[in-house]
């Protein structure tokens, strides 16, 4: 689960006549990725497969469009009986053509309407800046005393216009879009400005005769609305027709996917006069299974690829439980893991929801996010989307952790429903919220962790400092583990240069923050005080104060200096070896990349995790501010009175929608940033290729 599966390169040699049963066996196994043979027994390919695979893929795309427009879940169903895969591909392709023919008119109508709509929308976009002009442009351009020109230009043309027009004439412009301007030019008739501007490449707006921009804009808008109505009616007609043969369409779709994969094997195979050669990758632990399946049909052999130095890197297969496999979609944003890399998914399954929950600690907001995620998951499934359900499950995991942190923080759509005006005004004479005594987490728990609560009724004068240290401690731990994984990856790669000149210097650097912020373990009862003392010792060591009183501080400074010098030297050697630089420039570049940049990254990456505290604070105080505004507009001095006031309710709803929508999105993005930039960059390159086996999408009879 943590490491990619060991792969072998499988070679199958058989009589040409055995091709169909061999392909059937490989499809049923669903664990074989075909490749072009390394040492082909001949140059001859199976031409029928090469010719058919393009047509089959085209049918797959068309059926997906039909299913999507018809509102069907895009999934394969049914079975297929095969004696010859070439014959099966021809038959299924013909069947798909007949199916598509039944929807041809509706699809063409939808396509025509979409094209027409796109054309009108482009015209609207061009008219948008001048849509408020109610005068015909032809009348504007034919004044007796002045030349009037209205044009759309870029920044370079705008400067050119100012040079041509000079100071004696009038130029007015306003910006719209990126580096685009609408320009109104009024000039005297005798200077022939229109001709000069045409020569400079400036073209004035020309519209249909007899209509102002205002009239034309509204006519086009009305036409688009009419097209939308017709388009919706046509889609409904298509959806109704598709529903009547849903299972048949899904069966044809499944058969197309299956013959496509069969043709993919055949397309990469090589044949001679008598023999067939098939090669590809297969998980090593399942080799015996494939041997048992095709032992009586063909001769099979395999080799184990080296992890480093091969011309072709094997595909990567990381077998994960279904419950966490969805996180693969997040990792793939960064890139697929290489064959020798530790998968970051297992790392991500814990850290991503935890960091999200710490930055979004509100039970009510998290509950809304959970319900939205469940709806979004069902919506994605209905649309047949691959990414929406995966993203939804990630949000579900994250919102569950946010519910837990919200319970501990005693926040439910802000501080008002639980802490009440007592918390908002920090005054014990006011009432608590209606949920105060009903809260599932007793107040004693919040009292016990008050040293880590940076806000709310139970926070203390030092809790902000403690939470800051705790946030950086999380970062130090994450960076240490990330750099350690980088060393392990380098060892697995069996590349000494990669290990000793890239990953080991990085690991030695990121030992420093974990040592500093974990030093408090030496005295757990005074953990945060000890950490603050160590930070003080480091400052004293930098300022060259007494050695005997700051031994640990001096040790940390010396270790950091050694690690930075090592990183400097390592980068200098890499620049010298790979960029053919002189020693002088190599040392200079090594200092910039390894010494100076290394020190900056050590500091910035570690401190970057303070954003965990910052976003938790911002979430709380956004809702605190709206709760206070609700208190100000309500005439009541009791919490219940505020919560039932209509204007106060509207203010609280607006504040919570802002927190859920904007803050939730920002926290999700920042969580991704902490993983991709601060953590993954220490050990994960993501330059591999994903294992994509061929398989049977329907039952093979």
UniProtKB/Swiss-Prot annotation:
- Principal localization reads membrane
Can you quote a single GO CC term?
vacuolar proton-transporting V-type ATPase complex
Free-text function comment from the UniProt entry: Component of the A-type ATP synthase that produces ATP from ADP in the presence of a proton gradient across the membrane.
Which species does the entry assign this protein to? Saccharolobus solfataricus (strain ATCC 35092 / DSM 1617 / JCM 11322 / P2) (Sulfolobus solfataricus)
So which domain of life are we looking at?
Answer: Archaea
Give the UniProt family note.
Belongs to the V-ATPase 116 kDa subunit family.
Keyword DNA-binding: yes or no? no
Gene Ontology molecular function, alphabetical: ATPase binding; proton-transporting ATPase activity, rotational mechanism
Q: What is this protein called?
A: A-type ATP synthase subunit I
| Signal peptide segment | none
Q: Which residues cross the membrane?
A: 340-360, 363-379, 388-408, 435-455, 468-488, 498-518, 555-575, 583-603, 612-632, 649-669
Q: How does it sit in the membrane?
A: Multi-pass membrane protein
Looking at the keywords, is Ion transport present? yes
A matching Pfam family: V_ATPase_I
